[in-house]
Each structure stands twice: as C-alpha cells, then as structure tokens.
C-alpha cells in the first residue's frame, strides 16, 4: 500500500523568511530512501485557522485514499505553538500528559534552578498528546511527538520542529511505525556517489541512454551535494540493480564511490592509520568532517590552520622564497604544506588544502575557485591535485573539503591518486 504523502512545516519564522525549512527536504529524502514519494510540501505560519484548514482537507481526502501527513513544529511551550490544540479540534479528542516525559521535564527544569522551576506549569504542555494516539518519545528534547488517525490507513504524524529532535525521532521512533503501517514488498535499494559530475550531465550521459534497458522497473533519484551527487536506485529486482551498478562503475571508474565519510572512518580505524591536516581556505572544514564520527580520536591526530603566508613558513617550515615564487595557492606550496605537516605530526596520512575561496583574490591565471589539495600516503608518496570549483565562497570551501575526503577514500581503496 502506498499512501498519498504530504509534509507540513509550521512556523511563522519559516513563512517570514527568518529561518530556512530544512526539515521538509530531509524528511522527503528519507522517505524516498524508504521507497515512498512525497506528493506535496506545505509551509504554514503559526496560524491555527490555516493549520486547521489544511488538516481538515487532508482528513477529507483520507476518506477516498490512504493519506500520510507528516507535520513538524508547533509542539513547544509558548502561546504560538498550535499543533496539539488544532489536532484536538480536528479529532474532537481531549489530551493527557505523558507521565514519563513529564517526570523527565521536571528533573531537567528543577536542575536549572528556581527560575525554571517556577515556569514548569506552563511548559508541561509539551508533554501532552491526544487521547488514544501513538506516542513518539523525544530522546533529544522535551516535546512528545505522536501519530493520530485520519481514517482507515491514514495518519497524521506530529513531531517537533527543532531539526535535531525531529531527525532523531524520525529515525528511531517513526520509521519502525511507518513500516508497520504501510508494509512494502521486498524493495531493494542501492546507493552510489559520483564525484565532480552534475545532475544534468549524469542524466544525459547515463540515465537517458539506458532508460529503456534499466529504468522501466527501477526507480532512480539524485541528491546534489557539494562536489558529488548521491545516486539512489530502487527495485524489487536485485539482478537488475547489480547490472545497473556494474554499468555505472564501468562508465565512471574514477568518479564512483560508496559513502566516503563512513568508509574513511571505518578503514582508518581498521588499518590503525593516523591522519593530520593543514588547511588554509577551508578554515578547518576538513578537520571538522574527519572528527564528526565517534571514535575518530583513534586516527585524527590534529592539524593546523595556516591562513597567512607567515604561518605557513613559521609553523610548517616552508621557505618564503617558495611562496613568493609560486604563490600561496600553488602545487608547490600545497606539496610543501603537507610535507611540513607530516614532519611535525608523524601521521600516516597528511592532507593540505590551499585555495582562493573568493569573492576577492582571483586572477586570470588563478581565478576564484582554484584549490590545490596535497595528499601524503603511508608509503611517503605525495601527490598534489589542482581543481577549479564553481560557486560562491561557501560552495568552494565545501567542494574542497569534500574532494579532499574523496582523495583519502581513493587512496584507502588502493586506487591511483
């Protein structure tokens, strides 16, 4: 059974443009990976009448077809949080406090001191849910999520709008419930990443020529990221999926990868190798990404942010003449940066990044987006790669740090870097 899926994000900060709705896109992508397609995404202000009108329309639609509505926001403690109130009006139910959540909230606020303890009665509303609903525990925050029936095989899911709370609740609490509510046939999913290639080029080069051969019974989707695209293929035919992946690997042998971030983490742990970084234009982004997973302290030894030429010379021992002759953004300086880094840290792997992130600083010879990435491997070999990344400052920095991780991935895979 496939429901008609609608995502609703509530919050006047969203409709006023003060905040960006990241929840809807994230939920839609998660649902696609589970084999479901979203039909509509709606953004609403904190207006109980507008919210009620949309929910009432979905309740009416649920009389004809299965509907799954997923709503985020409006479960907080303030007077502009209308989700529970609106759902109670829609269903004609009363609410009750989830005792476990109420006890947890009490402990948290009492620990914060008298001022917080005094406002407990007003914040208890976050623990209230409709009678008879399925509750969704909040392991990160306070507000309790819930699943309310909209009719036969139709449901309204309400979750907090805080992204960290919503994502954890979705993955740990909601997904198991969705699989019970809407059992799927044995859908198989395969995912690959392709580097330095855009969505449109991928569709033109791979999807269109193979549409009649591969994609009559296989769903596909692409998520664009900085430096790579994430390609997802879904089918009940595992043989067809394997054929598609083999064809993909044949066409893009040097650009294809699995989840780079996870593989680098797991492989560095497995091999007991260490790594250090020296960054200029990326300002620590690579170090941040290498340390996002628990356990990274086993392999990440540290790094340097050598933004100025003086720091490059003083910390890494790069001759000033080298910088003056070739420029701070050059193959020669990227080589010297990673060489000096590994002399200091003694790590198995070393990575250097130097570039022009813009918007100023570019030239005809080295335009904005020029980035040099140096990689030292455990065998002592150093190779420098030069790129010209598109986009604004943020995009160039993200492209550079992600591509550096891809180079580490390729080296760990034993590919020629």
From Swiss-Prot:
Classification via SUPFAM superfamilies: CinA-like, Molybdenum cofactor biosynthesis proteins
InterPro entries tied to this protein: CinA, CinA-like_C, CinA_C, Competence-induced_CinA, MoaB/Mog-like_dom_sf, MoaB/Mog_dom
PANTHER family found in the cross-reference section: NICOTINAMIDE-NUCLEOTIDE AMIDOHYDROLASE PNCC (PTHR13939), NMN AMIDOHYDROLASE-LIKE PROTEIN YFAY (PTHR13939:SF0)
Protein family according to the UniProt entry: Belongs to the CinA family.
Protein name in the entry: CinA-like protein
Organism: Leptospira biflexa serovar Patoc (strain Patoc 1 / ATCC 23582 / Paris)
């Amino acid at each position: 059974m496939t429901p008609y899926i609608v995502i609703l994000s509530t919050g006047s900060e969203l409709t006023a443009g003060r905040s960006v709705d990241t929840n809807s896109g994230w939920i839609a992508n998660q649902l696609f990976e589970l084999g479901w397609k979203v039909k509509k995404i709606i953004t609403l202000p904190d207006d109980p009448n507008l919210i009620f009108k949309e929910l009432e329309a979905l309740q009416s639609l649920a009389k004809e077809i299965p509907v799954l509505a997923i709503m985020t926001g409006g479960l907080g403690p303030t007077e502009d949080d209308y989700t529970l109130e609106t759902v109670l009006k829609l269903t004609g139910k009363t609410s009750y406090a989830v005792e476990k959540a109420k006890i947890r909230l009490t402990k948290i606020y009492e620990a914060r001191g008298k001022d917080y303890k005094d406002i407990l009665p007003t914040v208890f509303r976050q623990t209230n849910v409709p009678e008879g609903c399925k509750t969704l525990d909040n392991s990160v925050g306070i507000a309790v999520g819930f699943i309310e029936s909209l009719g036969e095989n139709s449901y309204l899911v309400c979750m907090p709008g805080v992204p960290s709370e919503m994502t954890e609740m979705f993955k740990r609490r909601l997904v198991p419930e969705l699989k019970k509510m809407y059992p799927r046939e044995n859908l198989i999913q395969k995912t690959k990443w392709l580097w330095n290639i855009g969505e449109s080029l991928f569709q033109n080069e791979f999807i269109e020529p193979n549409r009649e051969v591969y994609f009559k019974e296989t769903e596909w989707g692409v998520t664009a990221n900085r430096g790579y695209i994430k390609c997802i293929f879904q089918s009940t035919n595992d043989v067809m999926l394997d054929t598609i992946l083999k064809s993909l690997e044949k066409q893009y042998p040097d650009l294809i990868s699995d989840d780079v971030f996870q593989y680098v983490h797991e492989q560095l742990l497995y091999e007991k190798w260490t790594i250090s970084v020296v960054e200029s234009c990326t300002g620590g982004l690579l170090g941040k990404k290498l340390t996002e997973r628990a356990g990274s302290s086993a392999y990440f030894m540290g790094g340097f942010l050598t933004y100025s030429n003086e720091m490059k010379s003083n910390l890494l021992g790069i001759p000033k003449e080298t910088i003056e002759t070739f420029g701070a953004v050059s193959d020669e300086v990227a080589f010297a940066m990673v060489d000096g880094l590994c002399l200091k840290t003694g790590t198995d792997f070393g990575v250097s990044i130097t570039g022009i992130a813009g918007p100023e600083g570019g030239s005809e010879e080295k335009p904005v987006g020029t980035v040099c990435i140096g990689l030292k491997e455990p065998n002592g070999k150093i190779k420098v790669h030069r790129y010209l990344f598109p986009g604004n400052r943020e995009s160039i920095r993200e492209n550079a740090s992600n591509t550096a991780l891809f180079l580490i991935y390729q080296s760990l895979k034993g590919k020629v870097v």
